[in-house]
From Swiss-Prot:
Stretches the record annotates as E3 ubiquitin-protein ligase catalytic domain: 293-574
Family membership noted in the UniProt record: Belongs to the LRR-containing bacterial E3 ligase family.
Name this polypeptide is given: Probable E3 ubiquitin-protein ligase ipaH4.5
Catalytic residues identified in the record: C379
Residue stretches of each LRR repeat: 63-82, 83-104, 105-122, 123-143, 144-165, 166-183, 184-205, 206-223, 224-246, 247-270
Ranges of residues in domain NEL: 295-574
Source organism of this protein record: Shigella flexneri
Swiss-Prot/TrEMBL GO biological process terms: protein autoubiquitination; protein polyubiquitination; symbiont-mediated suppression of host innate immune response; symbiont-mediated suppression of host translation; ubiquitin-dependent protein catabolic process
Entry superkingdom: Bacteria
Length: 574
């Protein structure tokens, strides 16, 4: 870029009435300091110009090529030293940039209020202009640019991309079309736009993330892809070479209206003993996830008898504007169309009773709304799994609030169920890792649903729609049941002694014993903690390692609590 030497630039950025006619490059350090000091005095009370000037002076005196003026709430910039090559002015309140600037190779202006950019330095290699919500277009890009991050702006078009570009991150804009992609491009992140088609992919591409667009087709994929995300588009078919991608590649095709034929073909191909392709994440779709929600009170009252609907509606109208109320309304409507709702006797009454409990507890309602927040994004089995989780939330809340204070047997039964579900989640997580074509929701729900009776899981639905695509076999279920019972026999009492609801009961019903246990814990930590951590680090040869010290400290803390709370639990349950 040319040296800054126009008077209007200095007046607009420094507020000076008179300024030297010499170019910035020729001004001495004293002149720089004078200009910056005047600029600092004329700033608003919210700007941290004094700190900015301090950093500018250090940069000038040391000839440091990197200048960081981020997070200072600056609304304008003073003249900058010409020797700097990397400039970070992110997370300020700038609405424009000067037309002239140093010969930068790296520029970070993300998190400002820019609505237009000046001509960019021709030597620029890396540019970050993300999170400028009013920025709708870009100037011509420098010829040697290698990395462009323009995430979450309001861009509607992109200029021609330089051939040197290797990284392009433009998620969360308003793009409907992309220009030709450079042949060296390795990372393309363009999720959350309005794209209906994509240009041909360069073979150099390693990471392709184009989720949440309006794509109806996908061209042939580069064979060296390491990550592919095309979730939440309008794809009904996939390129044939998707199954020939490397085995280490993660592929996400969930949220697309893929035909049953396509899904069955993929499942058949990926289940072959000879398959060595990528792991593919998908979701079963029933075509309802984009339906509009209705008012919360209407969705709730539909679960109640007609003679109660007026009173229920009046109560729930008060919750219409609570966080996640809209998605909770949609969840209730989707829940009514699940297999369990249609086939399980008393299901409607069960839901109505649960809704009454939610209306009486703001804390439980808040927790439940949050649990249901993402439940309608996929198929009805996601809704069913969410219903399982909501019933768990209710029971744990009731236990913490005292429902089982006088019924230790019922609390133990609830604890056993929560323990079994936790183990099943571990088993499901391990199973997901072994599958090449997987909908995680179906795997998690399959273990709960198919073992609900044998493991006495009162919170689990008894039917699911898409068990056939879960990949969970009869042998998996037998192995899981045996593992749950074995771990329950060996681990449950230790787990229960650390369970939060059990602690809440002890605080209320065994206050003196609880206080003694807490005192014992703190005495042990005060007298033994440091030495036990030091001994553990010494034994492993990691003395002085901060990360190892944190890990050892957490282990000692858990062992201490395990010892004390297990002793207390044994005494109370004896």
């Amino acid at each position: 870029m040319k040296p800054i030497n126009n008077h209007s630039f200095f007046r607009s950025l420094c507020g000076l009435s008179c300024i030297s006619r010499l170019s910035v490059e020729e001004q001495c350090t004293r002149d720089y300091h004078r200009i910056w000091d005047d600029w600092a005095r004329e700033g608003t009370t919210t700007e941290n110009r004094i700190q900015a000037v301090r950093l500018l002076k250090i940069c000038l005196d040391t000839r440091e090529p990197v200048l960081n003026l981020s997070l200072l709430k600056l609304r304008s910039l003073p003249p900058l030293p010409l020797h700097i090559r990397e400039l970070n002015i992110s997370n300020n309140e700038l609405i424009s940039l000067p037309e002239n600037s140093p010969l930068l190779t790296e520029l970070h202006v993300n998190g400002n209020n820019l609505n237009i950019l000046p001509t960019l330095p021709s030597q620029l290699i890396k540019l970050n202009i993300s999170f400028n919500r009013n920025l709708s277009c870009l100037p011509s890009l420098p010829p040697y640019l290698q990395s462009l991050s323009a995430r979450f702006n309001s861009l509607e078009t992109l200029p021609e991309l330089p051939s040197t570009l290797t990284i392009l991150r433009i998620e969360g804009n308003r793009l409907t079309v992309l220009p030709e992609l450079p042949h060296r491009l390795q990372e393309l992140f363009v999720s959350g736009n309005r794209l209906q088609e994509l240009p041909e992919f360069p073979q150099s591409l390693k990471y392709l993330k184009v989720g949440e667009n309006q794509l109806r087709r996908l061209s042939r994929l580069p064979q060296e892809l390491l990550a592919l995300d095309v979730s939440n588009n309008l794809l009904t078919s996939l390129p044939e070479n998707i199954i020939t991608l490397p085995i280490c590649t993660n592929v996400n095709i969930s949220g697309n209206p893929l035909s049953t034929h396509v899904l069955q073909s993929l499942q058949r191909l990926t289940s072959s003993p000879d398959y060595h392709g990528p792991q593919i994440y998908f979701s079963m779709s029933d075509g309802q996830q984009n339906t509009l929600h209705r008012p919360l009170a209407d969705a709730v009252t539909a679960w109640f008898p007609e003679n109660k609907q007026s009173d229920v509606s009046q109560i729930w109208h008060a919750f219409e504007h609570e966080e996640h109320a809209n998605t909770f309304s949609a969840f209730l409507d989707r829940l009514s169309d699940t297999v369990s709702a249609r086939n399980t006797s008393g299901f409607r009454e069960q839901v109505a009773a649960w809704l009454e409990k939610l209306s009486a507890s703001a804390e439980l309602r808040q927790q439940s709304f949050a649990v249901a927040a993402d439940a309608t994004e996929s198929c009805e089995d996601r809704v069913a799994l969410t219903w399982n989780n909501l019933r768990k939330t209710l029971l744990v809340h009731q236990a913490s609030e005292g429902l089982f204070d006088n019924d230790t047997g019922a609390l133990l039964s609830l604890g056993r169920e929560m323990f079994r579900l936790e183990i099943l989640e571990d088993i499901a997580r391990d199973k997901v890792r072994t599958l090449h074509f997987v909908d995680e929701i179906e795997v998690y729900l399959a273990f709960q649903t198919m073992l609900a009776e044998k493991l006495q899981l009162s919170t689990a639905v008894k039917e699911m729609r898409f068990y056939g695509v879960s990949g969970v076999t009869a042998n998996d279920l037998r192995t899981a049941e045996a593992m749950v019972r074995s771990r329950e026999e060996n681990e449950f009492t230790d787990w229960f002694s650390l369970w939060g609801p059990w602690h809440a009961v002890l605080k209320r019903t065994e206050a003196d014993r609880w206080a003694q246990a807490e005192e014992q814990k703190y005495e042990m930590l005060e007298n033994e903690y440091s030495q036990r951590v030091a001994d553990r680090l010494k034994a492993s040869g990691l003395s002085g390692d901060a990360d190892a010290e944190r890990e050892a400290g957490a282990q000692v803390m858990r062992e201490t609590e395990q010892q004390i709370y297990r002793q207390l639990t044994d005494e109370v349950l004896a």
